[in-house]
């Protein structure tokens, strides 16, 4: 796996799924391929994206700034600086300075990542802030190691939170989660079916499923009524899998 592929993988792991994730992936690919060289326009686009947390925007802004060649005097962006200040916690800043001193002696991506993984996400973000604000300089490889370690820390906590939700025994949360998954699956299938002339029936099934979820939410239903909802939807859509040329199993 190449260095840039690894960076793209880690960064995308902290971006919520949806159309915006596909857009960000495309921009990262363009930046890494040297196709997008307008850093100012890129940062303005990033600043106005909805859904993304300030920290995710800060990390993406840091990656774009590292990768896109720019004039030395180009202004640093406030939204990135604010995201990478470690929540203003002096402890984070102290740890970030210690980490920076270690990274300064490191030259490899993997070496930097290993060192950084023993620090908290707050300290890692503060260290990125030091480098972004030109208070410290490290090689691009080392900076990317720092980025990937930060993303790994964030993705780990997101995964723990997701696992807790999936494992919950609370019937109301399970019920709502099944309806959200069914609705999301239907929406994705509608988008994919849109490019196929023969997928009108699949579109209809997906649309009916979404209407059913809306109705269940509107009238309030028993927590067990959503059991199997997503699986039923997938079974129906399976019929049109060959016509649509889509691997529906991936949604399971």
Swiss-Prot record:
Stored InterPro entries: Flu_matrix_M1 (IPR036039), Flu_matrix_M1_C (IPR013188), Flu_matrix_M1_N (IPR001561), Flu_matrix_M1_N_sub1 (IPR015423), Flu_matrix_M1_N_sub2 (IPR015799), INFV_M1 (IPR037533)
Motif Nuclear localization signal boundaries: 101-105
Pfam families from the UniProt entry: Flu_M1, Flu_M1_C
Its membrane topology: Peripheral membrane protein
GO molecular function, one term: RNA binding
Keywords from the UniProt entry: Host nucleus, Membrane, RNA-binding, Viral matrix protein, Virion
Region of interest (RNP-binding), residue spans: 165-252
Example of a GO biological process term: viral budding from plasma membrane
Region called Membrane-binding, residue ranges: 1-164
Superkingdom: Viruses
Subcellular location: Virion membrane; Host nucleus
One annotated Gene Ontology cellular component of this protein: membrane
Family: Belongs to the influenza viruses Matrix protein M1 family.
Subunit structure: Homodimer and homomultimer. Interacts with NEP. Binds ribonucleocapsid by both interacting with genomic RNA and NP protein. May interact with HA and NA. Cannot bind NP without genomic RNA.
Function: Plays critical roles in virus replication, from virus entry and uncoating to assembly and budding of the virus particle. M1 binding to ribonucleocapsids (RNPs) in nucleus seems to inhibit viral transcription. Interaction of viral NEP with M1-RNP is thought to promote nuclear export of the complex, which is targeted to the virion assembly site at the apical plasma membrane in polarized epithelial cells. Interactions with NA and HA may bring M1, a non-raft-associated protein, into lipid rafts. Forms a continuous shell on the inner side of the lipid bilayer in virion, where it binds the RNP.
More details: Most abundant protein in virion. When expressed alone can form virus-like particles in transfected cells.
Protein name: Matrix protein 1
Chain's gene name: M
